[in-house]
Amino acid sequence: VNRNELAGLLERAADLIEVLGHGAYRAQAYRRAARSLERYEGDLEELARSNFAGLPGIGPALAPMLREIVETGSFPYLEELEGELPPGIQELFQVQGLGPKRIRLLWEHGIDSLEALLASEGKLRELPGFGAKSEARLLEAARFAQQSRSRFLLAEALVAAQSILLDLEERKLKAALAGSLRRGLETVGGIDLVVLGSPEEVREALGKHVKAQEEGVLRGEVEGIPLRIILAEPPTFGTLLVRATGSQAFVQHLGPLPEGREEEEVFEALRRPWVPPFWREPEHLGLQPPAPLARNQLKGLIHCHSTYSDGTTPLRELALAALQQGYSYMVISDHSQTAAYAGGLSLSDLQRQWREIEALNVELAPFRILKGIESEILPDGSLDYPEEILTRFDVVLGSLHSHLQLPFEEQTERVLKALRNPYLKILAHPTGRLLLRRPGAQADWERLLEEASQQGVVVELNGNPHRLDLDWRWALRFRGALNFSLATDAHSLEGLDDIEWALFYAQKAGLEAGQIANFWPLERWQHP
């Protein structure tokens, strides 16, 4: 496990401790330890060998348990907690708006699963802390969670798939990703593979992951994700890979598929150029694939968070990491003052950060840190600081974090007002969605993106695997009218690698380097 995964396990344990009523102090201790781990930037294995010596919040009671997790990958205490709860309780954590305290309240009133929650319409409003409106919001979130529970984030499914591919590779079995995972849809229903081998060979390689066999197909599961393995013979491996990758509309568009050992042979026989898997969606039919976008040609790191707000990395370390990764400038964008939940910056915080930025710009020249902010778009559409403060930023990003359930017209007017604010440069993660967790704000996005184009506002493609917002389909539709920025939205050094996801979805949207703000020279920000 890495430090963020370890912190996540501690947070999970703290949640279950609260639901079970095993003591608020114990839950708080686990959360303090999780925060401390998130801020730690050193080597986790070395820290474990030292029994977490000197790390705030981790004392002699927790240290041996954490060391065991690092060394073995198992967390027996968490398994014990999970065993004390009805299985359905785990699902309730997927419902937006439900935390441990509310889940405990629901459990005390006999609501111990998603199905039980959905069947409680008219009853929830009678519980302490609930009313008719909160009941309606919770039931809407529960329906969304129910629709999402058979889906998995692309990034998580890809990690699980890579472990299976390694097992097959060790047995010298040729294998390739297929399906929506290979095409790079943001959420997937499972892992599809095409494998050159017999059922016996694959079973021997994958062991318990294979559960069933059909004609030419093995089925199973890896880390809770459904697994489908399509068995191929050498002459038709490429043909099966094209068909299994899809999309169905793309395969139908190709017509009858000839035999081919590799995909390239299939396309050559069809007298068509090979099409990269990310460009095989129905939305791409009839369109030419874009030119590749290279990470090493990016000039600007845009949208990241430091310890001034809710990031875990000090500003100087973040700048040094950006410099080391080849960027020539960085737009720091900590949260604005209204975002108290995320350590939003007060006016005095801004002054402190600006002084540090000015000093670092001298120290690290010609690398430059631009004074940015991720401003809350307030419910009335205004930005989060007075004009005399907004004018002092180099780059103002505006984003939605709250009031995502405003009525359609009201939400549209809210974002329209923000887009017309002369200080707004970037509309960040526009809809505010969290994949499989909550839908984005409902608004007239066609009208809003047209307005962004007219106002010259850059629209963000957020690379956080939980967001991937703006949706690539909207970006594809507006690729001829808008400029875009690629964001890591990094809250840690590891988060800087999420630029890979942003680059991938920029390609899936057919974007060119010239319309992507991260490829722009510094001067374009200073003299728009």
Predicted regions and their residues:
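Short loop/edge segments at beta-strand edges and connector loops
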Residues: 177-179, 371-373, 463
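Charged, compositionally biased N-terminal leader segments and the immediate start
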Residues: 1-22
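Charged catalytic cores and adjacent phosphate/nucleic-acid-binding surfaces used
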Residues: 184-185, 189-306, 312-332, 337-367, ...
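Accessory alpha-helical DNA-binding modules that contact the DNA backbone or grooves
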Residues: 14, 26-191, 195-227, 234-239, ...
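Short amphipathic alpha-helical interaction patches enriched in hydrophobic/aromatic residues
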Residues: 14-21, 146-150, 400, 404, ...
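Catalytic cores of large soluble enzymes that bind and process phosphate-bearing ligands
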Residues: 2, 22-25, 58, 84, ...
